[in-house]
């Protein structure tokens, strides 16, 4: 029987850290050590360029003028849009206006389904890649897409796998290069939560009180003991209101933005935090930039990741307040044991799906290497298949 190791599952609160080094938001990670993780993929000449091109103040790069064409499905006013705008402003502010971005908001150039092909083909220079719809191509990104422990922990987890660990980063970045891509950072994605129409006090009463759990990802929640009804996010408000489902789980931010607090009174964070939306650049475009320009773009991506972490920590607090004011109930706080059980379900379900995705393409062994590191980083005692 697989068991969780002891996790230090402390919610990362308001942090005054420099940058998140991993994949959670649109930059590198939040700690000083992880802040350079995205930059770790840059060549040694890129690293030296960073010091040689910065001004005496250390934050202005002497670069020839250049432009990046950026496509995003986010609107400028959304959290994701604010993160991208930070990247744009950083480039301009740290190049005396010589680095500019031609930004296309709201999927006007490429929608979610098209943005991978768009950046891979060079139709656009950069995207904030929502990788989940593209796992059939980017197989090695199918590892569990969130982690326990808070915003910073999720970023550190993604950064370790994508940038810092020599074995896993070689697999993930190598696959990106095969598709003419380079990942620059990871962007924070916020907390995940349960909501229900019935009262519960812990994981046991959450599961036992449910007659119909609405979600598209049945494997995780069936592992926990729920009876799952397939319901998409766009239909969940109505399903909760009409009693077709009595409970669900998703990212806290979209749950609140879609108003589920109006039809579900009882809420709890599930202890996991998301990351992703890697700032991804066309590899040919990256190679066409000078070492100085590359150093600036990487620094902007690193700084943006840090910014995204703080933005999402603040957003989590604000969303919790919104829900509690609307429902009149405080969030249930799960015990460490409950959070361990939830993470076990997530890891087992996602690991099985990841291996099934990779095996037909001859990538099973590589994915097992990634999953072993993912388990190590999150403190989960995982036994790989056939071991």
Regions found by a protein language model. Give the residues of each.
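Short, solvent-exposed loop/beta-turn-alpha elements that line the ligand-binding surface or hinge
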Residues: 151-178, 355-359
């Amino acid at each position: 029987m697989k068991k969780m190791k002891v996790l230090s599952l402390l919610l990362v609160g308001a942090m005054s850290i420099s940058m998140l080094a991993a994949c959670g938001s649109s930059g590198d990670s939040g700690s000083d050590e992880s802040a350079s993780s995205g930059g770790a993929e840059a060549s040694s000449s890129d690293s030296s360029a960073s010091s040689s091109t910065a001004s005496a103040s250390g934050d202005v790069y002497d670069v020839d003028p250049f432009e990046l064409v950026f496509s995003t499905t986010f609107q400028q006013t959304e959290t994701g849009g604010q993160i991208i705008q930070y990247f744009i402003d950083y480039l301009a502010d740290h190049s005396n206006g010589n680095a500019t971005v031609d930004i296309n908001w709201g999927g006007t150039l490429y929608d979610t389904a098209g943005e991978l092909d768009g950046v891979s083909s060079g139709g656009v220079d950069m995207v904030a890649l929502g990788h989940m719809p593209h796992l059939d191509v980017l197989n090695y990104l199918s590892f569990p897409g969130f982690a326990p422990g808070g915003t910073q922990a999720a970023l550190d987890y993604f950064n370790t796998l994508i940038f810092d660990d020599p074995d896993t980063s070689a697999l993930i970045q190598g696959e990106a290069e095969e598709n003419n891509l380079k990942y620059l950072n990871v962007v924070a994605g916020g907390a995940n939560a349960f909501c229900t129409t019935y009262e519960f006090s812990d994981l046991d009463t959450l599961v036992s009180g449910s007659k119909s759990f609405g979600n598209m990802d049945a494997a995780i929640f069936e592992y926990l003991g729920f009876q799952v009804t397939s319901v998409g996010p766009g239909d969940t408000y109505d399903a909760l209101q009409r009693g077709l489902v009595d409970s669900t789980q998703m990212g806290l931010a979209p749950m609140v933005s879609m108003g589920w607090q109006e039809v579900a009174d009882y809420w709890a964070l599930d202890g996991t935090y998301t990351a992703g939306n890697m700032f991804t650049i066309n590899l040919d475009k990256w190679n066409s930039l000078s070492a100085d320009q590359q150093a600036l773009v990487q620094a902007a991506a690193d700084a943006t990741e840090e910014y995204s972490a703080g933005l999402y920590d603040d957003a989590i607090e604000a969303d919790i307040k919104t829900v509690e004011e609307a429902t009149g109930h405080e969030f249930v706080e799960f015990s460490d044991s409950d959070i361990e059980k939830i993470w076990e379900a997530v890891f087992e379900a996602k690991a099985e799906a990841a291996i099934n995705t990779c095996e037909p393409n001859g990538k099973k062994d590589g994915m097992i290497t990634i999953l072993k590191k993912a388990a190590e980083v999150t403190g989960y005692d995982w036994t790989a298949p056939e071991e």
